[in-house]
Structures are given as C-alpha cells and as structure tokens.
Amino acid sequence: MPAIRVKENEPFEVAMRRFKRAVEKTGLLTELRAREAYEKPTTERKRKKAAAVKRLQKRLRSQQLPPKMY
C-alpha cells in the first residue's frame, strides 16, 4: 500500500490527490476489482484475447491512411 507523507502546511486535498495518484500508479484498485469475484480460467482467457484483438484493431486503425476526400 502506498504511503504518503503529508508535508507541513500542505492542504488535505493536495495530499489526498497525491495519495490517489500513488494508488492508481500501483494498480491496486484494478487488482482489487479483478479479485473481487472468481473468474474461470476460460473466461479470463476469452477476456484477454478480446482485449488483445481490440488493441490490435485500434493500432491498425491508427496506422491506416485516411480515405481521400475529394
């Protein structure tokens, strides 16, 4: 768990923002949500495969030349 030292005369909101950023950087919340309920190995493989296909499609779409507009 990330630890944040609150500096002297630092507002609570700023310290809270730094803490949230540190938690987000470690990926703690995403890991917690993933472990919240059991996911069957086949479901996990299927989800990861779908995410990989989606990433590939996005990469190909960004590399593709735009259609001619004339």
UniProtKB/Swiss-Prot annotation:
Biological process, per Gene Ontology: translation
Entry GO CC: ribonucleoprotein complex; ribosome
Domain of life: Bacteria
Mitochondrion listed as a keyword: no
UniProt keyword Ribosomal protein present: yes
Keyword field: Ribonucleoprotein, Ribosomal protein
Gene Ontology molecular function: any one: structural constituent of ribosome
Further remarks about this protein from its record: Present in outer membrane vesicle formulations which are used as vaccines in human.
UniProt cross-references to NCBIfam families, sorted A to Z: S21p
Protein family according to the UniProt entry: Belongs to the bacterial ribosomal protein bS21 family.
Name of the protein in question: Small ribosomal subunit protein bS21
Organism of provenance: Neisseria meningitidis serogroup B (strain ATCC BAA-335 / MC58)
